[in-house]
């Protein structure tokens, strides 16, 4: 008579209850992890900046910053809701709620396009009008902002590309679709990670830590899929094919004389 262990060994991974449970809830975990990362980064940072605004030490937040924050927060909440609906078997509600992503994703991209030059203009104007004793410090801040623009450009382009690929695959490859949506959301998370002060960072000297923490955030889903499937899912291959070259460009241009001289001109400053 076969033992219980023999039966378990002969069963497929989907026949094991725990495996099936993790299959459903790993995406909820990833969405919740992204929400927690965002809150850990932005809440303390925002409180400090609000205090600086109230003390007259920095310019008020531009309206587009509030718009972008609300849109990104809505996207994260939508992701958490959508993954929970699928984990609990409510696919019909998932499909209906998914319509919101068709509005949110373009709005996030557009607000980001407006936000980047708006924030750069604030730093540029502050540096230009700074008193002599603060001029050097302000120029250093402007150089950092110029480098950060590289991460923002990468995030905007890759977020748009990944969402497009995910939406295109939603009816023909649900596995690719759900993973690519997670991967799309992962792309802009360095903005949160870099604000978590109790983490070790290489910023602003190098974006290496931002990229390593991004991969660390991805690891639970990636490792589970590797165990579960016994191979690297196509969604990761496509994502890395986009993310890796873009990251190489970011690292090559970071703090380079060419980028520091060219970037202001792209935004109309010289």
Residue ranges and their predicted role:
Residues 2-270:
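Alpha-helical membrane insertion/targeting regions
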């Amino acid at each position: 008579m076969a033992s219980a262990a023999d039966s378990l060994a002969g069963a497929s991974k989907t026949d094991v209850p725990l495996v099936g449970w993790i299959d459903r809830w790993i995406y909820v975990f990833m969405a919740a992890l992204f929400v927690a990362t965002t809150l850990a980064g932005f809440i303390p940072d925002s409180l400090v900046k609000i205090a600086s605004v109230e003390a007259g030490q920095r310019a008020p937040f531009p309206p587009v910053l509030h718009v972008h924050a609300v849109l990104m927060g809505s996207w994260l909440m939508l992701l958490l809701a959508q993954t929970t609906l699928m984990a609990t078997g409510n696919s019909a509600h998932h499909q209906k709620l998914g319509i919101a992503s068709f509005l949110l994703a373009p709005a996030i991209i557009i607000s980001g396009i407006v936000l980047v030059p708006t924030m750069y203009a604030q730093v540029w104007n502050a540096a230009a009008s700074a008193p002599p004793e603060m001029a050097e410090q302000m120029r250093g801040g402007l150089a950092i902002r110029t480098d950060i623009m590289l991460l923002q450009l990468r995030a905007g382009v890759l977020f748009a590309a990944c969402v497009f690929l995910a939406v295109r695959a939603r009816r023909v490859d649900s596995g690719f679709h759900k993973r690519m949506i997670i991967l799309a959301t992962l792309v802009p998370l360095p903005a949160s990670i870099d604000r978590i002060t109790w983490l070790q960072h290489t910023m602003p000297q190098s974006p290496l830590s931002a990229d390593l923490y991004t991969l660390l955030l991805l690891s639970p889903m990636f490792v589970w899929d590797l165990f579960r499937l016994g191979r690297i899912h196509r969604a990761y291959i496509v994502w890395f094919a986009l993310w890796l070259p873009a990251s190489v460009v970011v690292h090559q241009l970071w703090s380079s004389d060419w980028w520091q001289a060219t970037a202001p001109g792209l935004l109309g400053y010289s």
